[in-house]
Regions:
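A metal-dependent, Asp-based hydrolase signature
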Residues: 49-82
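Active-site neighborhood of HAD-like aspartate-dependent phosphohydrolases
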Residues: 2-47, 70
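An amphipathic alpha-helix signature
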Residues: 27-31, 60-68, 116
Length: 220
């Protein structure tokens, strides 16, 4: 049934991190910090990130050690690389305001393939860490999205309506629909959805209006 502003009850909102709450650039833009060619295939930053994402390394220190081994860069350069790539995303103030507004009415869960310490550092810097009731991250689970384990971790104990928001329909939201979540896709020019999501938004800032508008989101 549609969610109407007049009868809207608290929901369980599962939010992706990159592409929804924050925007990361292409990490290859900072290849010079490591002294590597950004055109290298595979780019050496990727296996280091994937190792963290998949739980093979468990801390920033271990990531830095691996990145240094892969690139030959100093630990100092690798720490600078982390600062520039993962700890300094674009985080519009409007997004922080949206998070605070949503958290005042709904339960918020952040669900990401990003490393927990990096997410927590950024959320704390912008004063929104307390907006989230839980962080579900693939390094802790050792299973990146779209493995179903993380989706089940995000589900509430009760029967609240569950909505997932992501800019990646094919990788994230199809599995969300499979486990009964309503999908809200942040439109992404780099992706063509396999099928129509339950709702579309242009930016994260549009989410409150969609949740509160008759017919905006047909909850599963």
């Amino acid at each position: 049934m549609p969610v109407s502003k007049a009868h809207q009850s608290p929901m369980h909102l599962v939010l992706d991190y990159g592409g929804v709450v924050v925007e990361h650039g292409d990490e290859r833009e900072h290849a010079h910090v490591l002294g590597v060619d950004p055109g290298t295939d595979p780019y050496p930053g990727w296996p280091a990130y994937f190792a963290f994402r998949d739980g093979f390394v468990q801390s920033t220190a271990e990531y830095v050690d691996l990145l240094s081994t892969l690139t030959g860069a100093s630990r100092e350069a690798c720490h600078e690389y982390v600062e520039r790539t993962w700890l300094d995303p674009e985080f519009p103030e409007a997004h922080a305001d949206v998070l605070r507004d949503l958290a005042s009415e709904h339960t918020l869960v952040l669900f990401s393939n990003m490393a927990r310490p990096w997410i927590e550092a950024v959320l704390s810097e912008y004063g929104v860490r307390e907006c989230f009731d839980d962080l579900v991250v693939s390094p802790d689970l050792r299973r990146p999205k779209p493995h179903p384990r993380g989706y089940f971790e995000c589900l509430p104990d009760g029967d609240e309506r569950v909505v997932m928001v992501s800019d990646e329909y094919n990788e994230d939201l199809m599995m969300a629909e499979t486990v009964g979540m309503t999908s809200v896709w942040v439109e992404n020019d780099d992706e063509t959805p396999y099928r129509e999501p339950d709702a579309r938004i242009s930016t994260f800032a549009d989410l409150p209006d969609v949740l509160a508008t008759d017919g905006g989101v047909s909850v599963r």
